[in-house]
Amino acid sequence: MRVIAVANQKGGVAKTTTAVTLAHDLARRGHSVILVDLDAQGNVSPCFGLPPSPGLYRLLLSLVPLEELLVEVRPSLWLLPSDSSTAKLKMILAAEPYRETVLARALALADADYVILDTGPSRDLLHDNAHHAADEVVCPVAVDHLALIGVAQEMETLKFVRDHGHAVEMAAILPTFWDKTTNESQINLEKLVQKFGDLVLPAVPRTTRLREAPALGRTLWEYLDPNHAAYRAYQRLTERILHGK
Ligand SMILES: Nc1ncnc2c1ncn2[C@@H]1O[C@H](COP(=O)(O)OP(=O)(O)O)[C@@H](O)[C@H]1O
Ligand SMILES: [Mg+2]
């Protein structure tokens, strides 16, 4: 089982979009996948046309076993949902011993090829838990002037977690909201490639199609044309995860 966190402390950089899209592609290709929503906004459920619900809260407080909380949202793809109870969860867990490894321990017995963690935008206890549970991180980054800062912060988090004894690696940096009509996109993409080299994947373009899909409870794979540049960019991400190149 490989656990992959989709993380960047900035909000609105396409973390949830990336987690949903990657998880569904791995499932479409025949792997069993658990998608975990770690954000109190509970944005993952609506992407599948479902209301948010307190799955994460119940799991991490050991109220209900994982198998009973998972919702099958597509063939081979199970969702552990979240909602506003996740905010309360952070306060309750703050008093626990070994509090940054609660998620890792809860997922240790999970039966899946991949676990994909969609994280929230703040550096908090659940963010620490995601990094302590993850083997690898995918960092989506909007190619604006804050792009480099977002990735640098994520790299610092990875170093911190490694220094505390948990092996976790950056698997891919995914530039998002690429806009061919602005110099800003190009300049910031070039800066990312200069600094992080092959870790940086081809950029996902800004497209209203990607905004429309979740509103209809559909994923990118069910809504975009396979020739669309965003479709191809997300295919490259899956291939990086599967084959490491
Ligand atoms: N490439 C894109 N082009 C246009 N809109 C996008 C793109 N990727 C994501 N979005 C939209 O941008 C918003 C923020 O994306 P989201 O994945 O929720 O980010 P995060 O989880 O980092 O806050 C959502 O409405 C989403 O549908
Ligand atoms: Mg999100």
Question: Where does each model-flagged region fall?
Answer:
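P-loop NTP-binding core
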Residues: 1-245
